[in-house]
C-alpha cells in the first residue's frame, strides 16, 4: 500500500474540513485514493459535500466579449497575478477573446488564428509574449454561446479593466422580446451564476456518473439512521432534489431575491419583455477553477450589486 504522506492528508483536510486523524484513516482505508477518501469521509458523516479544489494554482485573466447574438469567454493563465496588471497581457487576452467569437471552444483552432496587427498567429504571439514578459503563459480554455433571436449577456466579477477579471460569465437568452429588458435580465442571471456556481443548465444535463456517485453517498448516509429501506429511498430522493437545487441552474433559487427559482424568473420575464424567454445556455469561467478564495460572502456581495 502506498505511503500516506502528510501532503495527502493536508490536501484532504482542505477539501473536506475533516479532522487530521479522520483524513489519515480515510486515505489508509482507500489506499491513498483522494476521491474515494472524500466519499469515505462523507459516508461516515465526517465531511461536507466534496469540493473540487486546490489542484489548479493558476493566475492570469478571464476575458468576456459579446456581439449582438453571440458571446465568448476565454481563460489565459500566467504564473503570477502581477502579469494580470500588465497592459500588453491584458490586450492579448482581450483580442484572443474576440477571436473566440469565431472559433468557439476549440483552443487549437484559436491558437492558429492570425493575431491582429502582428503578422503572427495567436500561438506565435503568445510565445512572443512569454519571451517579453518572462513568465510561462497558456490559453487554458475558451467557450462561445449564440442565439438565433435574443441576446447573449456577459458579466465579469472582480474586473481589473472592462471585460477582464477573475470570473467571467455568459448567458444565452432566446426571445423576440425587448432587447434592453432582456439584457437587464441576462445581466442579473449572469451575476447569479457567478455567485451560485451551477454545474448544469437543467436536470437532464447533470453528469449521470456524478449523480450516481452522489446517490451512493446519500444512501449510505441515510442508512446510517437505521430506518427501513423504503424510508431510506424516500430520504435519498429528497436529498437528490436538494442536490439539484444546488447544482442545476434552472432549479437554483435566485440570489437577488432569495426565493424564486431561476426557472420561474425566466418564465415570468416573458411578461416584462413582451415575448416568451428561454434560457438556452451558460458559461462560467473562474480563474484557476477550484482554488478556494477568501471572500466574506460572495453570494451576498453579488446580490447587493444586482439589487
UniProtKB/Swiss-Prot annotation:
It holds the Pfam family EF_TS. Keywords: Cytoplasm, Elongation factor, Protein biosynthesis. GO terms for cellular component: cytoplasm. InterPro entries: EF-Ts_dimer_sf, Transl_elong_EFTs/EF1B, Transl_elong_EFTs/EF1B_dimer, Transl_elong_Ts_CS, UBA-like_sf. SUPFAM superfamilies: Elongation factor Ts (EF-Ts), dimerisation domain (SSF54713), UBA-like (SSF46934). Residues 80-83 are annotated as: Involved in Mg(2+) ion dislocation from EF-Tu. It is found in: Cytoplasm. GO terms for molecular function: translation elongation factor activity. It comes from the Bacteria. HAMAP family: EF_Ts. Associates with the EF-Tu.GDP complex and induces the exchange of GDP to GTP. It remains bound to the aminoacyl-tRNA.EF-Tu.GTP complex up to the GTP hydrolysis stage on the ribosome. Belongs to the EF-Ts family. This is Elongation factor Ts.
Amino acid at each position: 500500500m502506498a505511503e500516506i504522506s502528510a501532503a495527502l492528508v493536508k490536501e484532504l483536510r482542505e477539501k473536506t474540513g475533516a479532522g487530521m486523524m479522520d483524513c489519515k484513516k480515510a486515505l489508509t482505508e482507500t489506499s491513498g485514493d483522494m476521491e474515494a477518501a472524500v466519499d469515505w469521509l462523507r459516508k461516515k458523516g465526517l465531511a461536507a459535500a466534496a469540493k473540487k479544489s486546490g489542484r489548479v494554482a493558476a493566475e492570469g485573466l478571464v476575458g468576456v466579449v459579446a456581439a449582438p447574438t453571440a458571446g465568448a469567454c476565454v481563460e489565459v493563465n500566467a504564473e503570477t497575478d502581477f502579469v494580470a496588471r500588465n497592459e500588453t497581457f491584458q490586450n492579448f487576452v482581450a483580442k484572443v477573446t474576440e477571436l473566440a467569437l469565431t472559433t468557439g471552444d476549440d483552443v487549437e483552432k484559436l491558437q492558429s488564428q492570425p493575431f491582429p496587427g502582428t503578422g503572427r498567429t495567436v500561438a506565435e504571439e503568445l510565445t512572443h509574449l512569454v519571451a517579453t514578459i518572462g513568465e510561462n503563459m497558456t490559453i487554458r480554455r475558451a467557450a462561445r454561446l449564440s442565439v438565433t433571436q435574443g441576446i447573449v449577456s456577459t458579466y465579469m466579477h472582480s474586473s481589473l479593466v472592462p471585460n477582464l477579471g477573475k470570473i467571467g460569465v455568459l448567458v444565452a437568452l432566446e426571445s423576440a422580446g425587448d432587447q434592453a429588458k432582456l439584457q437587464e435580465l441576462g445581466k442579473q442571471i449572469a451575476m447569479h451564476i457567478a455567485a451560485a456556481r451551477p454545474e448544469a443548465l437543467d436536470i437532464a444535463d447533470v453528469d449521470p456518473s456524478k449523480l450516481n456517485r452522489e446517490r451512493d453517498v446519500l444512501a449510505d448516509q441515510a442508512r446510517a439512521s437505521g430506518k427501513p429501506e423504503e424510508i431510506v429511498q424516500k430520504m435519498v430522493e429528497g436529498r437528490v432534489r436538494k442536490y439539484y437545487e444546488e447544482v442545476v441552474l434552472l432549479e437554483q433559487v435566485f440570489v437577488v431575491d432569495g426565493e424564486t427559482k431561476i426557472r420561474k424568473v425566466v418564465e415570468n420575464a416573458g411578461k416584462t419583455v413582451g415575448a416568451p424567454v428561454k434560457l438556452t445556455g451558460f458559461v462560467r469561467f473562474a480563474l484557476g477553477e477550484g482554488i478556494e478564495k477568501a471572500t466574506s460572502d460572495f453570494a451576498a456581495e453579488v446580490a447587493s450589486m444586482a439589487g
